[in-house]
From Swiss-Prot:
Name the record gives this protein: Protein UL79 homolog
Record lineage: Viruses, Duplodnaviria, Heunggongvirae, Peploviricota, Herviviricetes
A Pfam family assignment: Herpes_UL79
Organism encoding this protein: Human herpesvirus 8 type P (isolate GK18)
Disruption phenotype: Lytic replication is able to proceed normally with the expression of immediate-early and early genes as well as viral lytic DNA synthesis, but expression of viral late genes is severely impaired resulting in no detectable virion production.
SUBUNIT field: Interacts with ORF30. Interacts with ORF34.
Family: Belongs to the herpesviridae UL79 family.
Gene name of this polypeptide: ORF18
């Protein structure tokens, strides 16, 4: 048992265990070895891809059989459509074509017929958000007829914004503490979704009785309390967000924290 409510499904490897303890002890990322940092970066990329595809599948299921643009676009921020517009311009689509409904319909049919173009448009959006690794979208999600609506709906999700923030500002001393804060949560989440850590159902009851902080933070607190590791208040070590941080985390007029 790692905590009162958390156990290992099988013993963690020495490397994973070392990383987990360093994160739980809130160690500065600059003290990690190069191999550890490369692995953490890989985990962040994997979590971004995993979260993106899970959210896209959720939206595709929710929007199945829906053709009403108002309904489909209900969760898509205007900022996303501006990125899509810029991406289409980069692909050579003129403003005149986008203003004509017939041209828009033909363009959408063309993009769906040429999945490579649709993937390229999605990659443009990711790059504008600072996510430059090879984002792998499951073919089933990519060929969904409502893909752009689905993608626009999920980009503001907290998990994707947190992972995207870490990837966009990876290696920047100015952003280290915020990257560390998000990377810690994402690493513990990775251990849970990969089946290495198994929270008990009673964890949620305990968390709800102690000022419910969220499932991942509840796991962190449980393990820390078991081993006597100090729990750091967010306000105690996180600086006030800079303009660059607020611009990224609030890019879609939402609260990512």
């Amino acid at each position: 048992m790692l905590g009162k409510y958390v156990c290992e499904t099988e013993p963690l490897s020495p490397g994973l265990r070392r990383l987990m303890w360093r994160f739980l002890q809130n160690k500065n990322l600059n003290t990690f070895h190069a191999q550890e940092l490369r692995f953490i970066h890989l985990v962040l990329c994997k979590m971004y891809n995993f979260g993106l595809n899970v959210y896209l599948l959720r939206e595709a299921t929710a929007n199945a059989g829906t053709y009403d643009e108002v309904v489909l676009g209900r969760k898509v921020p205007a900022e996303v459509w501006k990125l899509v517009y810029d991406g289409l311009e980069e692909m050579g689509v003129s403003s005149e074509m986008l203003l004509c409904e017939a041209y828009r319909d033909s363009l959408w049919m063309h993009l769906n017929d040429k999945v490579g173009l649709l993937r390229g448009l999605a990659n443009y959006l990711f790059h504008r958000l600072g996510v430059t690794h090879d984002v792998r979208i499951a073919p089933e999600n990519l060929v969904d007829g409502n893909f752009l609506f689905n993608l626009g709906s999920v980009l503001p999700c907290r998990l994707l914004l947190a992972a995207g923030y870490c990837l966009a500002f990876w290696g920047s001393d100015e952003h280290e503490r915020w990257v560390r804060f998000f990377a810690q949560k994402l690493f513990i989440c990775y251990l849970i979704v990969s089946g290495r850590l198994m929270p008990q159902r009673s964890l949620l009851v305990w968390a709800s009785e102690t000022g419910y902080p969220g499932p991942v933070e509840a796991v962190c607190r449980d393990i820390r309390s078991m081993y006597g590791i100090r729990t750091y208040a967010v306000s105690g070590y996180l600086p006030a967000p800079s303009e660059a941080q607020l611009a990224y985390l609030g890019a879609f007029n939402n609260n990512a924290v």
